[in-house]
A protein has these predicted regions:
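Immediate post-signal peptide segment of exported/extracytoplasmic ligand-binding proteins
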Residues: 24-42, 73-78, 171-177, 349
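Extracytoplasmic "Venus flytrap"
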Residues: 28-37, 42-62, 84-91, 113-114, ...
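Extracytoplasmic ligand/sensor domains, especially the bilobed periplasmic-binding protein
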Residues: 105-211, 261-290
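Extracellular/periplasmic periplasmic-binding protein-like sensory domains
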Residues: 251-332, 405-409
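Segments of small-molecule ligand-sensing domains
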Residues: 317-329, 340-398
Length: 411
């Protein structure tokens, strides 16, 4: 009888241990960041430093997720968006991203900002099969190197293609152009220049001077002075907002008034008006040409569109603490919409793999925050979600569209 009790006790203990081991195994196999009620995602953004104006993107994206949560969430789950400040410094991006993955156990890194910051953790995230998606940078890498880095995908039109648009336009419309180029001397700026030169084609000999700057420089006035001295009558700027504004202001102060082409990430109404105010004249920004692919908050052409109506509702309800007419708000919400759309299609019990599958099987015109008619399209062999844009010219305090929506080959 005593032996039976001992045997039964041992069997019971084995059952408990087995059950515990099974439960532990199941817990380990569960998708990180996903519970029955919540999906946790995260990203690093520059809330401080030279690129802090981009922090608006994260705040608006978070506001959109709050709006979605207030209206039922996604497949019964609320989205929690954890953002950390890396100051646009890759040395900070690495430990902060590891914190998001290893301590916060995020489901995915969504919207992470900056070419160099994103590159600094791409290998780490891909080796751990953590989705690094809809990154806030148009570097061509995200679309061209997908075989080596299958867990990374961008969102916005890529910089090479955008640069080509400006080059093609100048080659076609400014036969006597003498071009000075200012670019951020890293992968971000070099992508723009590569596309710009390709767009110029045989006209690339119109470039008379190129100047690269470092984000650690306090002033780029010396670069602008050299560009002016070159005799350039056309100025292509591939810079982040702080340096783009500085370039415009310094050119004005030096009494240099070339035809200016400005990359889209710095070409917003808010930033142009800040530049004009700093220069002391609207003439400093008059006629600047840039491109757009999202709705512009204070553009009367889109005031009555469903996207702009939704935008104002989200801003009023969630109060992200950003300026209503800051175009980076729309960027953030458009990005948020893209993630929510993919999460819905990733299934009732989403996995990291099913999220990537959804992102790579997209074909929609439904994103309300993009320009009317724009298509978001991907496939197993096409990892560039957006490849359309429209040329805009700054006049009367805001960018005015001209020409049609352009579709360009991804590069």
């Amino acid at each position: 009888m005593n032996k039976q009790i001992v045997v039964l006790g041992v069997l019971a203990l084995l059952l408990v241990v087995t059950a515990a081991a099974t439960a532990s195994s199941t817990a380990r196999e569960a998708t990180p960041g996903v519970t029955k009620k919540q999906v946790v995602i995260g990203a690093t953004f520059p809330f401080s430093g030279v690129a802090s104006s981009y922090g608006v993107i994260a705040k608006a994206e978070a506001a959109y997720y709050k709006w979605v949560n207030a209206h039922g969430g996604v497949n019964g789950r609320k989205i929690k968006f954890v953002t950390l400040d890396d100051g646009y410094n890759p040395a900070k991006t690495v430990p902060l991203t590891k914190e998001l993955v290893e301590q916060d156990h995020v489901f995915a890194i969504v919207g992470q900002l900056g070419t160099e910051p994103v590159l600094s953790v791409r290998q780490y995230l891909n080796s751990h099969k953590v989705p690094q998606v809809l990154v806030s940078t148009g570097a061509s890498y995200w679309g061209t190197q997908y075989k080596k880095y299958p867990w990374t995908i961008g969102w916005q039109p890529n910089y090479v293609a955008e640069g080509a648009i400006y080059g093609q336009y100048i080659d076609a419309h400014q036969k006597s152009a003498k071009i000075g180029v200012l670019f951020q001397n890293d992968d971000y700026g070099k992508d723009y220049v590569r596309g710009f030169r390709a767009g110029l084609g045989k006209g690339k000999n119109k470039i008379v001077k190129s100047e690269g700057y470092s984000i650690t420089e306090q002033s780029i006035a010396a670069h602008i002075a050299l560009l002016k001295a070159s005799g350039a009558n056309t100025f292509f700027i591939a810079a982040t907002p702080t340096f783009a504004i500085q370039a415009i202001v310094v050119a004005s102060k030096l009494n240099w008034h070339p035809k200016i082409y400005l990359n889209s990430v710095s070409g917003t109404n808010d930033l142009m008006n800040i530049a004009a105010q700093s220069a002391g004249s609207q003439d400093a920004v008059k006629g600047i040409i840039s491109t757009a692919y999202t709705l512009i908050p204070d553009d009367p052409h889109y005031a009555k569109t469903p996207g702009m109506k939704l935008y104002r509702k989200v801003m009023a309800a969630e109060k992200p603490g950003t300026r209503l007419n800051d175009a980076f708000n729309v960027y953030g919400m458009g990005q948020g919409w893209a993630f929510v759309n993919a999460l819905k299609r990733a299934g009732k019990n989403p996995t990291r793999k099913s999220l990537m599958k959804a992102l790579l099987h997209t074909n929609t015109r439904a994103n309300p925050f993009l320009l009317p008619g724009m298509v978001t399209k991907t496939s197993a062999s096409d990892h560039f979600p957006l490849n359309q844009a429209r040329l805009d010219k700054f006049q009367g305090g805001h960018f005015v569209p001209f020409g049609k929506l352009l579709t360009y080959p991804n590069q």
